[in-house]
Amino acid sequence: MNKNIVVPKNILADFCKRHHIRTLAFFGSVLRDDFKPTSDVDVLIEFEPGHVIGLIRLAGMELELSKILGRKVDLRTPADLSRYFREEVVRSAELQYAQG
């Protein structure tokens, strides 16, 4: 459980189901002691197979999740991450929602 931010699990699950998200995890400063009141929340998502999202829809999802969490959200998929640090982010991410 993340100590830096309170996550309404039922609302988060509803968000993920509506947007065909298979997994949602936190990464970055939200998992560390240097997380501040002004810090954004880095979120890693994976969509259901075959579900493709455009940039405008992704931006809308980012805004919606920002309202849910009460902070600016930076929403990313593994493909969005640099190959130089993708594995580290995926390995260290803290799962918040998993489909099923």
Whereabouts are the PLM-identified features?
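Catalytic core of pol beta-like nucleotidyltransferases
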Residues: M1-A25, L31-P37, E48-G100
